[in-house]
Amino acid sequence: MQVETRKSGIEVIGNIPWGTHFCQFYRTKKELVDTLVPYFRAGLENNEFCICITTDNLLADDTLKVLSKSVKGFPDYLQKGQFELVPYREWYLKTGSFDSARVLQAWEQKLNQALQKGYAGLRFATNNIWGKKNDWCAVTDYGAAFNNVIGNFKIIALCNYALSGCNTSEIIDVIGNHEFA
């Protein structure tokens, strides 16, 4: 059986199958943006519903400005609802604390909504610095649970971590919960 692959948009990674859950560590905001722009461009150009979970390091206004300058037709993608920006507090901490089961269910609901609207699948990126401010064990357990189920879905997930915000054991935790870094 042939596995359907998607363009990652990231040259060193190439094509990836649905169900890919990977991460990157970045040193600067520029490194983060240099990955996110081609990643989202590939998703938008290939009829994927895209979500960017923003943090204090990656603000919504900054993200919109960069994508508007870098992705041809970005205002059209935004207007038709193919791209969403969601603050991490609204996505991961919606009930005031992190609830892994609720977040996993929310991803599945977003995917189902995207498929019903005719999109090929769901592509998202999140900057996981928010996890440091909360329960790191709960966040790493969520990462492992997500990694165990993502293969069943038309989802591609890129988790971004500020290298300056992770110690050695946390880096090992992160790498262990992703297919590759």
Question: Residue ranges of each PLM-predicted region?
Answer:
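Non-catalytic regulatory/interaction regions at protein termini and inter-domain linkers
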Residues: 1-181
